[in-house]
Regions:
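Phosphate-group recognition and catalysis centered on beta-loop-alpha active-site segments
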Residues: 1-211
């Protein structure tokens, strides 16, 4: 038991080191400019979102709207425009989409480049559902020098009623630090699939919070 506690403590310290470095880079990259200031609104509560933007139709609708941030789910799957498995915009259990991640982010990037006023540009929230998609997507994001606000999200720990989390927290943070150091981190727990299951399992434990 003591050996297990020492191992968990070492993993926690290693994770905390990586996380603190990411946090420092994020703060430096933001240059004291909040998302509200970027979009020229009074507070973050005034930010308008397009959620589950996982199809070409949904993306076109979001780009023509007055939303500030476009959120989409990302996993490895099949896209009609590509002959092999690629990162696509889809929410599990779906593994097929008409919109790849590259087309998703390029469409937003190109639209932003045609706009001078940052208040009219679009930021993105990348909601990763598959750890295999993280590295290739963040590398591509860096390669095009995407310069609007980016939130990076994933459930990287087993949480309330959840199990079998496929993300490795340290690897996720390392990828963000390397390829999207100025992004805003939005991480969480993989929880149970139903409300009844969540109630049955009770609240989060202190061990989960301290991780």
């Amino acid at each position: 038991m003591a050996r297990m506690r020492r191992k968990n403590q070492e993993e926690s310290e290693d994770f905390s080191t990586v996380a603190s470095k990411v946090k420092a880079d994020v703060s430096e990259g933001c240059q004291d400019c909040s998302i509200a200031e970027y979009f020229k609104v009074k507070s973050s509560r005034d930010i308008k979102w397009s959620h589950a933007t996982n199809s070409s139709y949904a993306l076109a609708k979001a780009l023509s709207s007055k939303c500030h941030m476009i959120e989409g789910d990302i996993l490895m799957g099949v896209c009609s425009s590509y002959p092999t498995t690629v990162a696509i915009m889809a929410h599990p259990p779906n593994t097929v989409s008409d919109l790849s991640f590259e087309d998703f982010i390029l469409s937003i990037h190109n639209e932003n480049n045609s706009i001078n006023d940052t208040a009219e540009k679009k930021g993105v929230k990348l909601d990763f559902k598959d750890p295999e998609a993280v590295l290739c997507c963040l590398k591509f994001l860096k390669s095009i020098s995407f310069d609007a606000p980016v939130f990076v999200n994933a459930d990287i720990w087993d949480g309330n009623g959840g199990s079998g989390c496929t993300f490795v927290a340290k690897d996720f943070f390392s990828a963000v630090k390397s390829y999207a150091p100025n992004s805003v981190l939005s991480v969480g727990w993989k929880v149970g699939k139903t409300y009844k299951l969540l109630l049955k399992c009770g609240g989060y434990t202190w061990e989960q919070v301290e991780r």
